[in-house]
Amino acid sequence: NEEWVQGRNHSAIEIFNEVLKNHPSGTQAEEALFRLGEIHHFSLNNSTRALIYFQEVLQMNRMGPFSYPTQKYIAEIAEFGLKDYDQAIIEYQNLINHYKNENEGSDHQYRIASIYYKKQNYEQALVELNILLENYPDSSWAEESKFKIIEVLYTLSRCPEAREQYRHFTLEYSDSRFKEDMDFVVASCLEEEGHLQEAYNRFKSLEGRYIYPAILKMKLVGIEQRMKKNP
């Protein structure tokens, strides 16, 4: 392990292969395969090879001491390395189903919701975010999930629901870090529904506070032009 930390990957690989030769099964073999997976994943940037090692760990012992971190790596490689989103969803679901004791279910549920969002399957993203809130109400992801729900509702042109959720949210989290983003979403809803003056006032109130001033400026100019056309 020390040799790997010092960056001498190939030497470490030889050592772990030697361990596997002498101990083809059991905890030492599981650790050797796990470490080989980590070396290929992090140091050699070979996620495909790493995946093979990680899968071998699980084949050897699905409930062993290395199985949970291994399953996490497999899910992350599927999502971020291979961008195989359908497989990633399966792997995160495996984490939720098989490792309840780890108390990280809400993290994996949030990843599933995020993947559906990335896939632009907003209806399913909404379902997954609501599952997160139902199953893990005290999760550290709760606040962000509630914000994401408002964002998704706006994306789905379900503005009355988005505004309703916004009202609940502001009562629950009076000084949320998502406040500006949510105000922007609600202003966009008002604009979409044709409440131009109200939308304009909301956008205007975000000046100096919103993280993307250029987009805000574009919104204000766009509404000004629409109001000139339809006074």
Describe each region flagged by the PLM.
Residues 1-231:
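Acidic, polar-rich low-complexity tracts and alpha-helical solenoid repeat scaffolds
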